């Protein structure tokens, strides 16, 4: 996750938007203006050793990122996932300007400095027309590997208001990375607001389950059969049970959703991929292997979550034995199947 240095986007914004942000600030989708998050995160939600020795936030120093992550783990490609809130403004024109500036920032300040990195196309997802414009502007640029959306949305992503974004993704052969987070229009759970960080961290998975069900049951993958979506940082142990539950419901009530031509779990095996972070840690490590097998080894993509505090070390996160073929799929082949890597 790359971090913004103070004022880093200014050089990529027009004078109109620099003045606007200086005078009015960013109008995010929150309950209160400029409220602090609660439950509290750890500082920058990051590892203690990820703070660059030269100063700045974790993830803001390309040289230190190169040393601590890319070189340390022999990483060929690393996909940037900016969590900087530029696509969640209530002011859609502001969101479009900020997304475009953030895309320039990723390309120039990170990928141009370290060609093993690849950027994500940030889009103002509640403005499909502006999103399409940004996708078409960046899709041919080798520095961009995917389109990034957030899992907390104004409406479920399967709704047809979002379909133009999916059409543009498929037409440009770009995958979508659906990362946890997004708008904060309401409480993070159907039960209200949590009191503890441990609750809040667990609740992140719920938005992923909801979005997976929406995408499948609204018929997105029938309309866009070549669309590839990777669910990122929502965990994955829940995936088999969701598939089983949806299949059972579909068998009884399929006439309600005639747009769903196949059992829902089949779409999960053809159009969805799952990033591994955060890795679950059962007492018996082989239980996790069973989860991989239920989902399918070809669906799993390693993710580090660097520089966050729950970083998953590729050497330590998976405590069961893998064959060489399984390692290649998890750490290499599946990512090459999902993402657009061009040199």
Residue ranges and their predicted role:
Residues 1-343:
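Helix-coil boundary/capping segments in enzymes
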């Amino acid at each position: 996750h790359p971090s913004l240095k103070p004022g880093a986007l200014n050089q990529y914004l027009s004078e109109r938007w620099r003045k606007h942000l200086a005078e009015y600030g960013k109008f995010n989708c929150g309950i209160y203006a400029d409220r602090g998050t609660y439950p509290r995160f750890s500082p920058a939600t990051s590892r203690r050793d990820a703070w660059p020795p030269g100063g700045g936030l974790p993830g803001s120093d390309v040289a230190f990122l190169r040393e601590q992550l890319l070189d340390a783990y022999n990483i060929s490609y690393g996909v940037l996932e900016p969590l900087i809130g530029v696509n969640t403004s209530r002011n859609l024109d502001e969101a479009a300007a900020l997304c475009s500036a953030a895309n320039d920032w990723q390309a120039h300040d990170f990928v141009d400095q370290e060609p093993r990195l690849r950027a994500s196309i940030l889009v103002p997802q509640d403005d499909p027309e502006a999103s399409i414009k940004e996708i078409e502007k960046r899709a041919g640029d080798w520095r961009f590997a995917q389109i990034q959306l957030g899992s907390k949305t104004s409406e479920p992503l399967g709704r047809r208001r979002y379909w133009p974004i999916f059409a543009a993704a498929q037409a440009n052969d770009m995958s979508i990375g659906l990362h946890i987070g997004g708008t904060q229009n309401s409480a993070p759970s159907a039960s209200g607001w949590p009191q503890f960080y441990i609750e809040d961290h667990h609740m992140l998975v719920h938005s992923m389950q909801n979005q997976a069900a929406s995408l499948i049951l609204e018929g997105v993958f029938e309309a866009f059969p070549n669309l590839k979506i990777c669910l990122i940082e929502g965990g994955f142990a829940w995936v088999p049970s969701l598939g089983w539950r949806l299949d059972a419901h579909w068998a009884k009530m399929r006439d309600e959703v005639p747009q769903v031509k196949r059992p829902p779990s089949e779409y999960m095996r053809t159009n969805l991929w799952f990033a591994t972070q955060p890795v679950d840690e059962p007492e018996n490590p082989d239980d996790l292997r069973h989860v991989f097998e239920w989902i399918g080894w070809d669906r799993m993509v390693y993710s580090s979550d660097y520089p966050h505090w729950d970083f998953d070390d590729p050497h330590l996160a998976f405590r069961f034995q893998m064959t060489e073929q399984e390692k290649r799929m998890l750490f290499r082949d599946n990512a090459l199947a999902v993402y657009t890597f061009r040199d």
